[in-house]
């Protein structure tokens, strides 16, 4: 399952599986911290092979690799003993963080699972902020290119 939460996961996915959208909303807010003026739902959902719901193939660019890395980070979170109570779903874990200018800091009071997931989201948001955005990869035909 592609990790990048944005549209589908914030609405349909969260409603269908009883997932707390708060944790997903935090990731959206982190992206907005790292990239002021961005619209994560519109900008990153359905970008490349990994940004959005699902993910497969070879990432098409640096931004898409950020999404693949985030997917893999959430996969790793599922395997952590400290995250087992989440019913193998890192999307349900909310955490504490702060944003100052474009600097994101995960709160040291987060438990081990919260800290891990917070850092997954933090690293992805920072990665997004540094990666070029290629409009031709938005709404990419994944069956053809991934």
Swiss-Prot record:
Entry annotated with the keyword Kinase: no
Keywords: Autocatalytic cleavage, Calcium, Disulfide bond, Hydrolase, Lipid metabolism, Lipoprotein, Metal-binding, Palmitate, Phospholipid metabolism, Pyrrolidone carboxylic acid, Secreted, Signal, Zymogen
N6-palmitoyl lysine lipid attachment residues: 78
Other observations noted: Loss of activity upon alkylation of His-70 with p-bromo phenacyl bromide; Ca(2+) and Ba(2+) protect against inactivation.
Family annotation (InterPro entries): PLipase_A2, PLipase_A2_Asp_AS, PLipase_A2_dom, PLipase_A2_dom_sf, PLipase_A2_His_AS
GO molecular function, a single term: calcium-dependent phospholipase A2 activity
Entry protein name: Phospholipase A2, major isoenzyme
One Gene Ontology term, aspect cellular component: extracellular region
GO terms, biological process: cellular response to insulin stimulus; fatty acid biosynthetic process; intracellular signal transduction; leukotriene biosynthetic process; lipid catabolic process; neutrophil chemotaxis; neutrophil mediated immunity; phosphatidylcholine metabolic process
Active site (UniProt): 70, 121
Reactions accelerated catalytically: a 1,2-diacyl-sn-glycero-3-phosphocholine + H2O = a 1-acyl-sn-glycero-3-phosphocholine + a fatty acid + H(+); 1,2-ditetradecanoyl-sn-glycero-3-phosphocholine + H2O = 2-tetradecanoyl-sn-glycero-3-phosphocholine + tetradecanoate + H(+); 1,2-dihexadecanoyl-sn-glycero-3-phosphocholine + H2O = 1-hexadecanoyl-sn-glycero-3-phosphocholine + hexadecanoate + H(+); 1-hexadecanoyl-2-(9Z-octadecenoyl)-sn-glycero-3-phosphocholine + H2O = 1-hexadecanoyl-sn-glycero-3-phosphocholine + (9Z)-octadecenoate + H(+)
PANTHER family named in the record: PHOSPHOLIPASE A2, PHOSPHOLIPASE A2 FAMILY MEMBER
Subunit structure: Monomer or homodimer.
EC number: 3.1.1.4
